[in-house]
């Protein structure tokens, strides 16, 4: 967690103190463009929202090899925390493979294929299958996966992910909608819908 101006020590402070069983770890630096969302709204609940979204036009989400090594040590080795490795593109899968080869991560690896964030791989069935094929090649049988397809693509690609052998993840963090134009009332509503589908 944490903000983009925080050091790795600041970003990991809560995890080091609370020692969670699992936390996410992004497998590389990337552009993380949320700014197109600012063009879709005229009214804001909070004054900071448009500036924050527009600020992502000139923002790099930083996770260097050194950052990742530090987090693997400080939260993983020293704290006993397992990781959900977030991969926003195929290069991130290769980065995870690098850490696996070096023995800095141990199977089973929990991989989250993240699709649909501007700056990462697009949200499509073809891209999800490409991510899966790449992970099969690079990680072999050392991993389990789930899918996060930001926004309107979530249920469709989570369903495909399940068909491909992945675990299922749904919730308001990933999509605010239960159907086209219809806001979800709760996480439970999304869980019930994916249970009906699968």
Predicted regions and their residues:
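N-terminal active-site wall of soluble small-molecule enzyme domains
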Residues: 1-19, 122, 128-134
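Mid-to-C-terminal alpha-helical segments outside catalytic/metal-binding sites
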Residues: 192-198
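A short acidic, helix-capping loop that chelates divalent metal ions and anchors anionic groups
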Residues: 176-181
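Catalytic alpha/beta core domains of metabolic enzymes, predominantly
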Residues: 22-172, 184-189
